[in-house]
């Protein structure tokens, strides 16, 4: 799944000119094509990214609020880092 600065709500490329210690977060709900009977295990992988080369690259990727129907994909950066895009793969395992 590819996400970038043209997706509504993307704030990871925004930098106001000071090293704000507060993280910038982007969330995207991922709906499973078929619901699981039980809570699945969700594995994420960062496949690629587009990050400004002027500063240190900082990017966290995690799954939150996992249900039988889907999960919230969360991308987070902080300080000077500007993230213009990220590609994430995911796998949900369960019954």
Spans of features found by a protein language model:
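Extracellular receptor-binding modules and their adjoining Ser/Thr/Gly/Asp/Asn-rich linkers
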Residues: 1-38, 47-52, 57-60, 64-95
């Amino acid at each position: 799944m590819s996400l970038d600065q043209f997706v509504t709500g993307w704030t990871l490329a925004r930098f106001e000119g000071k090293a704000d210690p507060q993280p910038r977060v982007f969330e995207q709900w991922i709906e499973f094509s078929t619901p699981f009977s039980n809570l699945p295990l969700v594995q994420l992988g960062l496949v690629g990214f587009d990050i400004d080369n002027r500063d240190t690259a900082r990017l966290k990727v995690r799954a939150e609020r996992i249900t039988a129907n889907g999960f919230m994909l969360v991308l987070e950066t902080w300080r000077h880092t500007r993230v213009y895009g990220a590609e994430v793969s995911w796998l949900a395992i369960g019954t």
